Structures are given as structure tokens and as C-alpha cells.
Amino acid sequence: MASSGLEALPLLGSACDERDGAHLAEDLAIVEVIDRRTGRALGHGERGNLVVTVLEKDNFLLRYDLEDVVRLNENPCPCGETHRRLFYEGRVRDLVPAGDRAVLPIDVALVLYEFPEVSTPSAEYQIVRPAAPAAELHVRCEHAPGVDPTALAARIGDRLRDRLGVPARVELMPRGGLPRFAYKAARVVDA
């Protein structure tokens, strides 16, 4: 994320040359990351909802929940900027419940890109949101020709389980098996 904003606050944050998150414009807004269920403020590195209070008199917003899932980095930045850094991870609408966790597409993508068999030239995947609470994560993904899909699905499922802490069922299909989108890929689909 090079920069971020909203209509009432055009520049919420911007990245420095370190490219390690967006430094927040904390002199223009109060930025909080909260637990979406409890409303409790979260600390360094914890994932939660982005809530903003804009301090400008003409565009005042009080604890506006942008429904973005983010985390804050409160460690000093090598660039010398003193404001905290924000990392955008996804949208609340893309959270998929699996066991006692909520998984975002970025969580799955980071694992898939460890497997060239599914990520070259790019990973095409979907996370299936269950109609009822489920103990496992269901991921559909395309694979390159010439691989053993059963063995590869097991390896990816094991890695997802190890990284995300929930069992995963991986459904592999040949390239071209998932729909393509002109604008933004639908990474989360309902069962």
C-alpha cells in the first residue's frame, strides 16, 4: 500500500522508501485497530478492524469503522518517521470462518505462492465460505500441467494447516478451471 485515504481524510497514510507499511497521518486522525467482536483496542501486530476519528472540523468522523482488516506496527521505522505504520490485509466481508479462526485471502495466497506448481505464472484460487460453521478451510486452486494433484493438494493442505492453525481441504483443478475476472478476482465464494 503506497497510500491510503477516505473521502473525509484524503491521506490516511503513506509509505516511505522502506516500503514497510504506511505511516499514519496521526496529526489529522485518531487511528485505532479494534477487535470487531468486543470493540477492544488491539496492540502492535494484532489484526483487527480499522476505526478512524477524523479531527478536521469540516469532515468530522467519530470512530468510523472502515471495515478494513489491518494491523499496526509500532516499532521505530529505519526512515526516522515517528508515526505508527499500518498494514492493510483485507476487507471484513472477505473473512472466512474456519474452526476458531477467521481467514483472509492474503493468508491463503502467502502459502500458495510457496508452491510453484500453483503460483506460476500466478495463483488462481478461491476460498469457499461455508453455509454453516465448519471446522476446516476449503480452498480451490488451479495447478500446472504434469503434477500429481492428489499429492500436491495434500502438501498444500498440510502447509495451510501448519500456517493458519486450521485443517484445510484443497481442491485442485487444471489451469483455466476457475473463472477469470476483468477487474478484481472474487477470492471468496459462498458454498
Model-derived segments and spans:
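Active-site glycine/GP-rich loop and adjacent strand/helix microenvironment
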Residues: 1-191
